[in-house]
Amino acid sequence: MGFKSNFLFSTSFVVFLFALMFPINGLYASSTLKGMQLGDSDAPVKIIEYRSLTCSHCADFSNDTFAEIKENYIDKGKVNFELRPFALNAIDLNAFKLLHCVDENDFFAMDKILFKDQKKWIVTNQSDKVLENSTNALKNYGALFGVSEEAFNSCMENENITDFILEQRIEGVEEYDISSTPTFIINGEIYAGNMSINEFDEIIEKEIN
């Protein structure tokens, strides 16, 4: 996305930040401090997507491919699909904080609109205020889902939510050696990068059969 390097989280910096946090307890929004899943938990194919809300390839997958996977596989009980955050920069971190502050019933709707409107809420016209302006834009999206300004500010400052998001990134790096987004884990196999619906069809059908 071309953000300044000071926004980027190296793995070591993320680990350092996470080490400073407190254990997750007394959760602000416990219902969404987890990997969010769609589909039958007993489905024969389990897909985990590690994604970044500021990643253009992740937006392409969400906007162009996911609906077909949902219609053809998730809704038919063939695939269980889990979304996990993988924050790449400070804007990402704030966007994920907001996403995990909304009501569980609104999670997937907000996830969808943040990808659909990605170029609207990532505000880059002032290079020295990208984080500030983008966070203010996110506040407006929170309002669409009933998140007041006070609740939004509380969300941005909540250490438990930050803890959870950074932990998810660390686990992705340590367990699956993830270094880019999107990365898909399909029945334990790692597939890095966006894929077409035809590629997903081939992999899923092979796993089912």
Give the predicted meaning of each segment.
Residues 2-91, 139, 143, 165-175, ...:
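Extracytoplasmic thiol/disulfide redox context detector
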